[in-house]
Structure formats: structure tokens, C-alpha cells
């Protein structure tokens, strides 16, 4: 009897043991997958909580740098169209406020802003085909949605109508190389957005904007103002060398003379100058272009010395030829190029760049040396109280981070894209980086206008007539 009962007990136990063995085998099969899945879920929870609970505090607690505004590529922070960005912004003063006077607007970061760009290329008829990247093949538009955020203050939003009112009956003149033209066309687009009837904006000589060399003058008839561009890559004239010069001297730069078109800029109310891209051996001595002072060609003078002497000539002209009571002068610094694996002649590229290099500089040592020369020249002449003050648009460091902003393959218009070995990594797509230069220009211009407006109000108060502008 006991034997049968043992058999029965064993027989009943077998299915249970077999089930346990099968469960163990299946558990061994699924254990790695469950482990990976669990690890993944824990990781997701940690990442989400990191951003949910304010990653600035987490970063600080671990001794990490608080660079929240540099994590913009994640789009978790500093989106001005969202209320989440208001905390840091509200702590900063407005640049145009009296308390914002000490703010360095060129010290800051690029932040993602979905309210940008300020215009669309298809809506602006004042753009060269070479700058209309999105119209002619460039499919990514990330480069249009970055805003410059100064570290210690907030820039004013560009107000095209207000700017045009300030320019009423005035001349705004850009002088420089094709990068200066890039900025000039950007400003035309920004300003034209406030004019409903675009037939009231026209080139006074009927010249087309695309592939036109020399100078162009666009009039905003409703405001009786002009926004002009004069091509002068060196700001000093390039001409035939003196008779008897060595055969290798094909042309010369007259370092002690202003460009011949300078008589056309002299009466400008606002003057924006730039030079830099042509001050290198490739554009000068290697092509037979040497430097001249008086009637003597300086065969041994290097490019940096020549650049410095030319800048001194420009500054002297500003101080002696311009009316300090009328003309505001701005000087924009060099905007770095971003060729990889060569330059524009040797197969350099930038077509794979779609994001900025946040927080780091991609500028060469030559670029920083050029900036130092410019700053030294302007600083040396800044203490002369009787002269025109030159305001520096110091965009070099901020532009150095924007390797993503160039036309690359998309500068040939409807005939593009260009061959891979012939890319443009010098100029800038529009809308794009030059719009930011103009936002900074606008901020400095409006800051300069504010004291004169206050002075007019005070004068009106003293006579009993108050007018607001």
C-alpha cells in the first residue's frame, strides 16, 4: 500500500518538477533580454528625470559646468517662443535700457529659437542667387533658427519699421568685400519686410542685384532713405604700379590713399565698413599685387604690416573727412571661413555641416591676429575726443562657431549644385548668420540714437514744445 502511495506521490510530483525545470530553462533563455530591457528602461527614466528636475542643478552638484544654453541642439532649453525660457531671460537687463550700457553683446551663445528666421528667402527679392541656399537645393533649415543670446543682457527684437523711421531722409552705406555685400543684402531683406508695397523699394539706376559689380543704391521711397553698397575689398585702391617697378609687380595697393569711391561715402549718415578676406598672400603678393606708399613699392612688406597701414589710412580719413555731428561709423570684423580639407581652390568642403560648433572657435591663428591688428588701430585712435567714434561690430568669435551657415554646394542658383571640389564656405546663406550681425548693428545703432532722442526732448521741454520720436 505504501509502495503504491509512493508511486502516486512520485507520479504527482513529476509534472511539478518538470514544469519547474522548463521554467528554469525558459528563464535562462529570456534573462539576457529582460536584463537589457530593464537597463534600457532605467536609463530612459534617469535621462527624463535629469531634464525634468532641472539639469543645471544636477550639473552643479557633480561639479560640471553650467552650460545650459549650449545644449541648444537638444532643443530642451532657451526656446524664446516657449515660456520655459523666460526665467534666464527675465534676469538679464535689456541692452537698450540704461542699466544695459555695460553689456558686451558680442559675448554670448547661439541658442535655438523657433520664432526664427525673421524672413524667408522666397519673400525677399533683394538676394543674390548665391545666397538663396534653401531655394536651390539645401534641404536642412536648422541653420536659420539660431539666435544670438548675449550672456548678460537681452538684445532688442529687430523692428524694421522703427529702423526705417530712424533712417528717414538718411543714407546708410555699406563698404567692403562680398561678405559686406552679404550683410547689406540681409539688411535689405529685414527692412523690406516692413514695406507693404515693394515697388516703393528700387535701385536708383535700375541695376539688377544679381552678379552686379561696383555699387548699388536702393531707395526706400516712403522713407526717403537709401541703403547702399560700394565694393572695396581693401578700402584702399588697387591700381597699376609706378613706372619702372620690377616685372613681378603686376598691381599695387596704395596703402596711404583711400579708395577712389570714398568721395561717394563721405556724406553718409551711417557708414558700415569691413575688410579682411582679401588681406592674405593668395590675394596679394602671390598674384603679383604688392604694397605701395607714395611712389615706392615695398617689396619686402608683409601682409599684416600692409593691413595695419591701410587701416591707419582709413581711420585717419574717418577723423579728418567725416562730420562727427552727422556720421555714425561701424566697423565689422572678419568673419572666418570653414573649409575642411583644403580651401576654395583646393577642394575644401563644408556641405556636411548642419549644426553650429557651440562654445568653441574654429578660427585660424591668422584670423585672431587680424582681429588684434584692427582692435589695436581703433584703440590707438579712440581717445581723440574731437573725432568720429568708430563702433566695432566684433562678430569674429560668434561667426567662427557657425560652420553650418555657408552655401557650400548651393551657390550656383538654378545651375547648381556645384561640384564637391568647388564649394563656397566663405559667404553665408540668407536668411542666416548675417541677419544676426544686423541685429547687433541695430542694437548698437538704436543705443546711439537714444541719447540724441533724449536730448531733443530736453531741448523741446526747455522751449515748451515736446516732441517724441
From Swiss-Prot:
Ranges spanned by the short sequence motif DCXHWCLPGXXDXWN motif, renumbered to the chain? 424-438
Task: Say where the protein is mainly found.
Answer: membrane
Q: Kindly give the membrane topology term recorded for this protein.
A: Single-pass type II membrane protein
UniProt keywords (A-Z) are: Membrane, Signal-anchor, Transmembrane, Transmembrane helix
| Signal peptide as annotated in the record | none
Write down the InterPro entries for this protein, in alphabetical order.
TBL, TBL_C, TBL_N
Naming one, the record's GO cellular component terms include:
membrane
In the record, biological process GO terms are: circadian rhythm
The listed locations are: Membrane
Q: Which domain of life is it from?
A: Eukaryota
Give TM segment ranges: 33-53
Show the GO MF annotations: O-acetyltransferase activity
Motif GDS motif: positions = 176-178
Instruction: Fetch the Pfam families from UniProt.
Output: PC-Esterase (PF13839), PMR5N (PF14416)
- Describe the function of this protein: May act as a bridging protein that binds pectin and other cell wall polysaccharides. Probably involved in maintaining esterification of pectins. May be involved in the specific O-acetylation of cell wall polymers.
Q: What else is known?
A: Contains 2 motifs that are conserved in esterases, but it is unlikely that this protein belongs to the catalytically active pectin esterases.
Q: Which family does it belong to?
A: Belongs to the PC-esterase family. TBL subfamily.
Protein name as it appears in the record: Protein trichome birefringence-like 10
Organism equals: Arabidopsis thaliana
Q: What is the lineage of its organism?
A: Eukaryota, Viridiplantae, Streptophyta, Embryophyta, Tracheophyta
